Amino acid sequence: MGVLRLRVDGQTFRDPDNREITLRGINVAGEAKYPKKPDIPSYVSDGFFDADNVSFVGRPFSLDDAHTHFSRLRKWGYNTIRYVFTWEAIEHEGPGKYDDEWISFTIEVLRIAKQYGFYVFLDPHQDVWSRLSGGSGAPAWTLYAAGFDPRGFKKTEAALVQNTFDDPAEFPKMIWSTNYTRLVSQTMFTLFYGGRDFAPKAIIDGINIQDYLQGHFIAACRYFAQKIHEAGDIENEVVIGWESMNEPNRGLIGVQDISVIPPEQQLQLGTSPTAFQGMLTGSGRACEESTWAFGGFGPYQTGRELVDPEGETAWLPADYDDTRYGWVRDPGWKLGECLWAQHGVWDPSSDKLLRKDYFAKNPQTGEPLNYDKFTNTYFMEHYRAYRDALRSVWPEAIIFCQPPVMEVPPDLKGTVDDDPNMVHAVHYYDGITLLTKHWNRLYNVDVIGVLRGKYLTPAFAVKIGETAIRNCLRDQLKFLRDESLRYMGTHPLIFTEIGIPFDMDDRHAYKTGDYSGQVSAMDANHFAIEGSTANGFTLWLYTTSNNHEWGDNWNGEDLSIYSVDDLELPSGKLLAFENESQRDPQSPAYSESQRNTESYRVGPRDLKQALQAPSISSEISQSSQDKLGFRAAEAWVRPSPIITNGQILQYGFDLKSCVFSMRLLGEKKGLGQEAATEIFLPDFHFPDTHTVVAVSAGEWTIDYPEIHSVKFQRLRWWHPEGDHNIKIQGVKRKPGDPTVSGEELSYLEQCQGGGCSVM
């Protein structure tokens, strides 16, 4: 293989010219979580249980539509895609039965992404294990392999599933994530990571269920990787690497007492069973469970509720035909009985708990366990096998290691796992905003500080006022960056998921067009990213079919930056071109490179007209009462360094004043094309007739490169070596209001008359 298009150099990404690359990306796409044929979003029940006979061909979008979506994302300044796929998409029909049609289709989608110059890394996505357990990810047959009967999940509350909820429209917001602490997900993750230790009787096809599940998952991903390798034009040219399994979870491993809620369990919502209560209701017993709601300071108990399955169980009956998928279950593993009862955790004849600390230590060795021990042993054992399988196909693959969310990362620094071609993949969400679906300008909480024991009491973690909240988000992300260097070693860090809900305040913005709350929340998250010194991010999420009624069409989530029911900010195609001869060649802003680059200007009047006639999807589904808005685009369509000739020291965008600033340590490379630092400069904020640029040294120009017919605005800066800075002033606007005030234009005109270099 030739020169790597993107390589890891310590904690930095570099291009073939040795310049620093910042990954500014997006997750593509939400539809990848559920099948295309039949089309079964999480609010549809028809055909839900026939999960073997599905197809993901056409996910996340058709080949015909791929150009529309990739060009849109490129126009918005994204250069990176976290490409979402599921294990189910590859191996839904049964163990070892791969969907080659889906793989071939995906390779064609990746070829189209290549035409737009994206860096793509592949995300084997899961949420709470599987679609049939209320999320996405693993094929349905994995549940049957573990002895579960998905049709019994509803009555037992072994998993809360929107598809089987009585009224899917009333499915409680964000309750899907509580499935991580319900029977099915707890069991599946325990078996996947620790079945040999905790379920030695679970033998299938002569091996433990841990090896069976992990073996099939890794083999499926390796098969996919091999097909990409054989394609010959995907590796390195568009796909730069693979992420490990999305949001791994310990299940029950390390839980000290299954008769109580673990003190470290942060989320409680709706009914909140202990692990033992989940085992009882999963076996048909009635239990009175505490009920919880989520408020401004976190979860609080609201009462108690009787969960009565009336004898129905979450386990397959003893007479189930276990030949369906061709495996042979060991006679010592009985169907029709809770797997944990079979391992002596509790007695089904008396319903008594026998070993409340069964998962607190390794049953085979007696070694004490906690979440850190899980991460450093069980998680890492799987990660190594996954990494090595993919590297056996493509040795140069960058592996994005994603440890358990919000937990201390594995201690790899200076060990054999301190892999120079590894990237730390981190997820972060502002939990209060996500769960309450409200941007609270009054207070927020330093969640990471609480989790890491920074405060004597959580009361000290409360941050008052929007400035303090923004700084708190930034400081949490900066802490995670520094923590990564301490534990993982010197590697790049990418926030591969971060985002906000758009259906805030009972969908107020959809009724009024006022996205000011979303703008503030999204801007605060980007402010945090920019201040964290991370190497980039992939925002969650882009969903092609997002709409005001069902959001992302998955569990009531509504995090997509795009919706068919909202407007898009105007693209360069809507802006009026200017005759190049009108430019003054003597102007300091004029350079030789501009003479060879197609450029255009837009005035305030043209901009306002363009904003009133935006480009939107041809498919509109919103109700007639909805008022179209710009979906907080002014907060996420923002300037960013893309290529830096040297080392980034600091950068950020002040949305309120519309000022981008950047400080760097430059390297001397001359004045060639490969020597420039490049900044994505969205023309929405920085129309070239009203943009003021100030640099400490060097020359700069604004041009409009074209990638596969997509034009975007870029600032290129040739600076000397050493410590230098740039400041770019654009057009100030009120949050949610795309128009330009006379006062703001007057300010810019004064800047123009002050001798600044103006584009």
From Swiss-Prot:
Q: Name one Pfam family in it.
A: Cellulase
* Region: Disordered, residue numbers: 576-600
UniProt keyword annotation of Membrane present: yes
**Which cysteines does the record link by disulfide bonds?**
none
BP GO annotations: ergosteryl 3-beta-D-glucoside catabolic process; polysaccharide catabolic process
Q: Which GO terms describe its molecular function?
A: glucosylceramidase activity; steryl-beta-glucosidase activity
What InterPro entries has UniProt attached to this entry?
Answer: GH5_C, Glyco_hydro_5, Glyco_hydro_5_CS, Glyco_hydro_b, Glycoside_hydrolase_SF, Glycosphingolipid_Hydrolases
Subcellular localization is given as:
Membrane
Output the Gene Ontology cellular-component terms.
cytosol; membrane
Q: Which UniProt keywords apply?
A: Glycosidase, Hydrolase, Membrane
Show the catalytic activity.
a beta-D-glucosyl-(1<->1')-N-acylsphing-4-enine + H2O = an N-acylsphing-4-enine + D-glucose
Q: How does it sit in the membrane?
A: Peripheral membrane protein
Claim: Cell membrane is one of the keywords in the record:
no
- The UniProt regions of compositional bias labelled Polar residues, in chain numbering, are 584-599
Q: Principal place where this protein is found?
A: membrane
The task this protein performs is described as: Specifically hydrolyzes the glucosidic linkage in glucosylceramide. May prevent accumulation of aberrent glucosylceramide containing immature ceramide.
Q: Which family does it belong to?
A: Belongs to the glycosyl hydrolase 5 (cellulase A) family.
Q: What is this protein called?
A: Glucosylceramidase
Q: Which organism is it from?
A: Aspergillus fumigatus
